[in-house]
Amino acid sequence: MYAGAGPVLVPPTPTPPLPMPAYTFKPPPRPDFGTSGRTIKLQANFFEMDIPKIEIYHYEIDIKPEKCPRRVNREIVEHMVQHFKAQIFGDRKPVFDGRKNLYTAMPLPIARDKQVELEVTLPGEGKDRIFKVAIKWMACVSLQALHDALSGRLPSVPFETIQALDVVMRHLPSMRYTPVGRSFFTASEGCANPLGGGREVWFGFHQSVRPSLWKMMLNIDVSATAFYKAQPVIEFMCEVLDFKSIEEQQKPLTDSQRVKFTKEIKGLKVEITHCGQMKRKYRVCNVTRRPASHQTFPLQQESGQTVECTVAQYFKDRHKLVLRYPHLPCLQVGQEQKHTYLPLEVCNIVAGQRCIKKLTDNQTSTMIRATARSAPDRQEEISKLMRSASFNTDPFVREFGIMVKDDMTDVTGRVLQPPSILYGGRVWEEPNAPLNKAIATPVQGVWDMRNKQFHTGIEIKVWAIACFAPQRQCTEVHLKTFTEQLRKISRDAGMPIQGQPCFCKYAQGADSVEPMFRHLKNTYTGLQLVVVILPGKTPVYAEVKRVGDTVLGMATQCVQMKNVQRTTPQTLSNLCLKINVKLGGVNNILLPQGRPPVFQQPVIFLGADVTHPPAGDGKKPSIAAVVGSMDAHPNRYCATVRVQQHRQEIIQDLSAMVRELLIQFYKSTRFKPTRIIFYRDGVSEGQFQQVLHHELLAIREACIKLEKDYQPGITFIVVQKRHHTRLFCTDRNERVGKSGNIPAGTTVDTKITHPSEFDFYLCSHAGIQGTSRPSHYHVLWDDNRFSSDELQILTYQLCHTYVRCTRSVSIPAPAYYAHLVAFRARYHLVDKEHDSAEGSHTSGQSNGRDQQALAKAVQVHQDTLRTMYFA
């Protein structure tokens, strides 16, 4: 409750701002600049902007009828500016964001308390369209205030000035290209880049205005995304259903073909081809079950009588068009209740529609191949982009007196020292054997485990093999060789597998998983592991993980058939890394002497992530995962996972999840952590305040619920991978690997970072393909008062503790594990989602039950809970 005076009468306009929460958390200022590591000269794809110290005038635009796409809104405003030049706009060049906001460099002749209403006519294909546009003054946006913020004289960067500058810089590109988010795309001229399934790659560029130390910067990057190919719907259908040509499809579609086709085309816009120049556009809402020859609709005759007429007959009578493919279904377009049907052959897919549905595995790999660029090539492409964009000749940018430098920004980075990695030795062979403690030193983010043994290897005495690959492809000889090789490699790694598997059988289909696993659990006492061999991508995988992780609490390790047919030391060694950890072993640890001071007291590292279902899927829940370290190395982690509201970014049950992890930490170590380091993945800048407010309070609440005075210091760090900052070596000799990337450990916290807050870029991994993307870390809260060096070194070291490989990874292990846990929970939900998605109109009551069923489905078995089942 807010305390205060009695009620005050407020005029109805303008709308008052929403009340802020009783207190807001403010991110900490940057404590200092890092100095650790050797310096390296870099260039960043940031271009300095020269901003005048003027005022910009902000107006609100209201277009009726509403809900036009931005492209249409832009046309309306452009027509308005031309048409009312004499009365209102004169020589001014306003910029518009496509929604509500219009900015001018000089004020318009509109009184501040008045609203001007104009009528704008857009010439249409059939008839002209008339719109009513209202303009009213909103505010003056001071660019002087921006200068004050960048130089540290103001505590925070005014959001409205950045928004205004962004609109100025995006106005012309938005008219020329197809905008998607903060990027602009255009169809590749001359050379198509097909992805299959009616999709293709469009190339473009990302552009955003960013505040940095002392200067505003323009961040420019090359960008690519999937669009639907503009083509006849018949051809689109052939691509989706893998028909060589339409001629081979003389029969109606089967149910499964129709369902697959519907899934792909639903929601897309098509244009008709049978009405000459009038290419009306419609949005597809469904595909009919019946072919055009049998699909009927109520047709009103001239006499006023209504008769049922087939689509094929209607096109013959009305349009003198005999359908070539009457055996194919129709598209249902517009509103579902209106029964508007179009034969496939009179429709084309409208150009410029971005594909938001999930790409298939093949499409994803084609996309990566088409878009991967070595760092020097990408640098050259970005420079070329800047030259062709030529912002300094853009009339709208010049109108506001803005200049942009043509060259990338020079930045001094630092390459941090990698930590030493400690392995173990043969402890169980002979009591007096020397402990072969081996230390590995990463070089360019990679180290070698050869001649070394796990820090703590597990002895495997009882294990089983279940082969779901066909016996003729994966023979008994293959299985025998695989078993021998795995035992040899595991022995060398210090994880001895004693004896042959207690069970080795062939099986088929997901339905046989649970009965087989129950038999194994009941028959073989002390069974530690089931190795499952899979024939490529199959539903068996999801079922193995569901049964193993959530139903019976059994450790499982899946192996692809091709890796059994041809074993390599590398794949077997990688298998051992995963198996040892799943069974409670420790592969390696950070050398204790080299760890940062934060390890001097009990500390828990938490990683958190929320994964959302693919776009266009409105039913599936989002999944929140939080993992916590369970030892001082830190090496072992425990996981908690929840389903939550569809596309909800804030972790709703965080307090209970953190409480569970703190209890587990205490059980594992007999210590209460005095510090909590929380790495939060997957939050965009616009959500910082909201996420921080809710989640920091949730972590505090978890502590206080355990003990009234328990107040460990919390450091809350957001980890971001989905940004467009790229760093390039200035000196050719510093470039690493085939792709010419920056070295692993490269850190930047000056010039391109936030003017006042605590953030930094760290590229902790060695780039293998394409240009490395440094991770961006933004500290939103810090009770522990880290210096820049301490936090940067700690973060870099945690990137070396990921158990699945002997390389440093691109984000700290706890954040990576949270991602794996959420991803695994998707598999646990597979059949539950299928069940609950069958009927789309479920009542409110059953939804509550569905929610409970989903929550239960991701609940991991008690025996699995304390293991790293997700590794």
UniProtKB/Swiss-Prot annotation:
Signal peptide: none
SUPFAM superfamilies: PAZ domain (SSF101690), Ribonuclease H-like (SSF53098)
Regions of compositional bias (Polar residues) in chain numbering: 839-850
Co-factor(s): Mg(2+); Mn(2+)
Keywords assigned: Cytoplasm, Endonuclease, Hydrolase, Magnesium, Manganese, Metal-binding, Nuclease, Ribonucleoprotein, RNA-binding, RNA-mediated gene silencing, Translation regulation
Highest taxon of the lineage: Eukaryota
Gene Ontology molecular function terms on file: endoribonuclease activity, cleaving siRNA-paired mRNA; metal ion binding; miRNA binding; mRNA cap binding; RNA 7-methylguanosine cap binding; siRNA binding
UniProt-listed Enzyme Commission number(s): 3.1.26.n2
Any single Pfam family the record assigns to this protein: PAZ
Keyword Transferase: no
Catalysed conversion reaction: Endonucleolytic cleavage to 5'-phosphomonoester
Stretches for region Interaction with guide RNA: 314-319, 536-578, 721-722, 765-773, 802-824
GO cellular component: P-body; RISC complex; RISC-loading complex
Residue ranges occupied by any PAZ domain in the UniProt entry: 232-351
Region (Disordered): 834-856
Family designation: Belongs to the argonaute family. Ago subfamily.
Protein name per UniProt: Protein argonaute-2
Species, as recorded: Xenopus tropicalis (Western clawed frog)
Lineage: Eukaryota, Metazoa, Chordata, Craniata, Vertebrata
